[in-house]
Amino acid sequence: MSGHSRNSEQEDTLSEELDEDELLANLSPEELKELQSEMEVMAPDPHLPVGMIQKDQTDKAPTGNFNHKSLVDYMYLQKASRRMLEDERVPVSFVQSEKNTQNQREVGDKGIKNMPQFLKEKLNSEILAKKRESNGSNNVQEAEDDDEDEEEEEEDDEDEEEEEEDEEDDEGEEDEDGEQANREKNDAKEQIHNNPGTYQQLATKTAHEQKDTSETKEKGEKKIAKLDPKKLALDTSFLKVSARPSGNQTDLDGSLRRVRQNDPDMKELNLNNIENIPKEMLLDFVNAMKKNKHIKTFSLANVGADESVAFALANMLRENRSVTTLNIESNFITGKGIVAIMRCLQFNETLTELRFHNQRHMLGHHAEMEISRLLKANTTLLKMGYHFELPGPRMVVTNLLTRNQDKRRQKRQEEQQQQQLKEQRKLIAMLENGLGLPPGMWERLGGPMPDPRMQEFFQPASGRPLDAQEVPFGSRKEMIKNPPQPPQCKTDPDSFRVVKLKRIQRKSRMPEAREAQEKTNLKDVIKTLKPVPRNRPPPLVEITPRDQLLNDIRHSNVAYLKPVQLPKELE
């Protein structure tokens, strides 16, 4: 009982001596925060989950939500970049410096107390190395004088004396450092005795310092045993080749100069796959193409063109009248740029092929619908390099392109017919001139006649004199009635009168021409007409008794109806 009473009395005295409120009041705000964090670590709240017990130890405020995937990707990129830098870095420590690394390891093992011995060994090794070099030089240079050897020995002695003095100074400094360290240790012990709560903080600090020193030692121990020339060589694989990645040898400045000068020998401008071409130069090329009249093909595939270049191309197509093929595939043009280009195609009648597939961004459904709508105003585009996602615009654009191809084919056929008629009339003129026939005699003798629909094409101009071949058939009759006075007509006029009478009995060709025109008009009308839909037969349906009854009721008469007694239930 006496021992228990003594312990209780000691506890009361200790509690009276250590007042917690006074201690907490004397602490600074920083010390209070540290004490709170230590208490949370020592005695965490059991009601909190494990993830909430360990708080963040960073002062920086969070910039966003935690994303594990992005963190892993960032760590992977850091590791890859560090590895690449280590492979590309030229080594600093070579094989010849193994002695220094061994000495550093020995110093790390011995500690701070053996520093003077290590310095002495290092100085002695340097002195021996210098002596060996001097001996080697003496052996190679035998013709040197003894005076020079004596001077070298004196210099070596002086160096040794200076090194010894340096060692003494270092020892004195180390002694002073040791005394300061002892003083700091004593002060720390006194602080720990007065404030037992700070003991744990000091322990953690010393642990961190030991870890840092071990890491620095490990970094110092790293070395490269052998030199690998492949690793020492500069690796240019990570560098982006800025000249011509795909082998396009186009001279940009020269090509731009030729485009501006409107060179007639330049029919194609190919800038494909020149990835590092400046945007300003691209705009210069497009603006120079506005007034060019000779380039037929303009290619800008995979050059990094964006919407500004697309708008410039739209303005170029509005003014240019020579480009037939435009290729802008594999760029960064969005739906707005493509729609602007398609909107300006209604003012262009020479472009036949447009390619804008494989863009960085999707055009979108609205842009595809707008493209199909704007293409209706263009009648010359024959090919389009793009795959539509929606089936509606795809079918509309396909039908419009087939329409343009049909118009192109019809125009080509008309040109061929005109060319054939020209050749036919030239042949008739050559025959009449070669045989000495009067004008119109070839037709009277049953020669081939041109198509009457093309008479307007061969009518003479108002200010030009009329030739014999260009005179219409009605005027030819008048010429035959009142022929000019050539020598042949004067010698034998009766023969022409006979031929004239014979020709009068035959049918004139004017109504034939009219009939042909009427036929052509009928053909055009027939083309515009639509076929009459056939009356489809009614579907075959089996007649039921109910249908028969209803049919009989419809076609029956009241006079033929028989009276029927009501059933008993209805009565």
Swiss-Prot record:
Q: Which domain of life is it from?
A: Eukaryota
Q: Briefly, what is this protein's role?
A: Essential for the organization of sarcomeric actin thin filaments in skeletal muscle. Increases the rate of actin polymerization.
Organism of origin is Mus musculus
Q: What protein name does the entry list?
A: Leiomodin-3
In what way is this protein post-translationally modified?
Answer: Ubiquitinated, leading to its degradation. Interaction with KLHL40 negatively regulates ubiquitination and degradation.
Major subcellular site: cytoplasm
Keywords in UniProt for this one? Actin-binding, Coiled coil, Cytoplasm, Cytoskeleton, Ubl conjugation
- Name the phenotypic consequences of knocking out this gene: Mice show severe muscle weakness and postnatal growth retardation. Skeletal muscles show the presence of nemaline bodies and have disorganized sarcomeric structures. Muscle atrophy is specific to the fast fibers.
Ranges where the record places region Disordered = 1-29, 46-67, 91-228
- Coiled-coil region list: 397-436
SUPFAM superfamilies (alphabetical): RNI-like
List GO BP terms, alphabetically: actin nucleation; pointed-end actin filament capping; positive regulation of skeletal muscle fiber development; skeletal muscle fiber development; skeletal muscle thin filament assembly; striated muscle contraction
Q: Where is the composition biased (Basic and acidic residues)?
A: 119-134, 180-192, 206-228
Q: Tissue range of expression?
A: Skeletal muscle and heart-specific (at protein level).
| Entries under Pfam families matching the protein | Tropomodulin
Q: What is the lineage of its organism?
A: Eukaryota, Metazoa, Chordata, Craniata, Vertebrata
Cell compartment(s), UniProt: Cytoplasm; Cytoplasm, Myofibril, Sarcomere, A band; Cytoplasm, Myofibril, Sarcomere, M line; Cytoplasm, Cytoskeleton
Induction, per UniProt: Expression is regulated by SRF and MEF2.
Acidic residues composition-biased segments: 10-23, 142-179
